[in-house]
Amino acid sequence: MVRGLYGGAHQRLEMQIQKRVVGPVVVLDVSGRLVLSDPGSDAQFKDCVAELLESGTESVIVNVANVTDIDTSGLSALVSAHISMARTSKRLKLIAPTPRMRHLLHVSRLDAVFDVCATEEEALAGFGST
């Protein structure tokens, strides 16, 4: 347990990735922390995307609604995944970023790089998979 700023206790959630398939699209539900201080979280994410590429997955949605914290290492992992997908003419979309993540994407100008959607339905429609 970690004490919060206001004395409340909360747990530090390590990153977890749940994979599910919606038609031809793989959805990665990412939760917890995607930060450098959590050893291996960025590598775990990169490995997951590499496995999808090796398996021939064409379209990936990364649901970041439950990412509780992200830093430059986490952003770097997302950028690396995007680049890996784009190099092989595959597509990656982010859905449901928190207000803080939206702000980080904006100030780093990554909002111009990623296709960011509010909902899974919107992202699937963009892939033509509704």
Please identify what each model-predicted range represents.
Residues M1-V21, G128-T130:
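Non-catalytic signal-transmission and effector/linker regions of two-component phosphorelay proteins
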Residues L13-D47:
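STAS-typified acidic loop motif
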Residues Q18-R20, I95, C117:
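General small-molecule cofactor/ligand-binding pocket signal
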Residues V22-P24, P99, E121:
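Residues that form or immediately flank small-molecule/cofactor binding pockets and catalytic motifs
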Residues L34-F114:
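Amphipathic alpha-helical interaction surfaces in cytosolic regulatory modules
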Residues H106-V107, A125-T130:
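Short secondary-structure transition/capping segments
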Residues D115-T119, A123:
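Short acidic-hydrophobic, aromatic-tinged amphipathic segments that line or gate anion-handling sites
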